[in-house]
Amino acid sequence: MRLCENQMKTREFTQILQENPGKALFFEYQTGQYVRTDYHITEIKNVNFDTVDCGGIRNQWSEVHIQLWENEIPEPDHAVDTSKAMKIFEVVNRVRETYSEASIKFEYGNSVFPTAVLPVHNIKDTGNALIVQLTPDQTTCKAKDRATSPEEKAAACCGPVAEKPKLTLVSLQQSDSNTCEPGSGCC
């Protein structure tokens, strides 16, 4: 349905929910690993970041984090579909507006997967369900990322990644015996 080359905006996500009423809503947090079908949406967070990177530049941005939670005791009669998810957004928006133009991410963890904030990679429509495929973010160095000139790249505290040293093969001397003595050159 939608492959996200850039991070999905909250507005895009809610639009997909609205266009697909009553469909099951599943989350894949790793390839082949799914949030249990009886999950709850427990919070919708407007998150504001105000950071200073290692190059001394201030960075500010906002995101929306949706917290997914699984009860310790499975609830086979509980499920969140696209319509119920939209109702939760509506409840939140009655209290305060959700940042519609901010990137949307999902906060999830369980006993075998540490809690992480995961962006949307893709949303698959199977006909009767939407599968939101999440993927982990990579950390990065903003000073290195914004450097465009050789001088800026050299000044970034994280600099370019050094190339791996090339390994060379060393010839082994042939020996008539199957033993190896220190200093003999056989190993």
Task: Set out the residue ranges of the language-model regions.
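Small/polar-rich, solvent-exposed N-terminal microdomains that initiate assembly or binding
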Residues: 14-43
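A generic structural signal for short beta-strands and their flanking turns/coil linkers
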Residues: 23, 35-37, 60-64, 100-102
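Short, solvent-exposed beta-alpha or beta-beta edge segments that form flexible loop/patches at the rim
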Residues: 34-58
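Helix-rich interaction surfaces within compact, conserved domain-sized segments
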Residues: 88-145
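Mixed-charge, glycine-accented linear interaction segment located at domain edges/termini
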Residues: 135-178
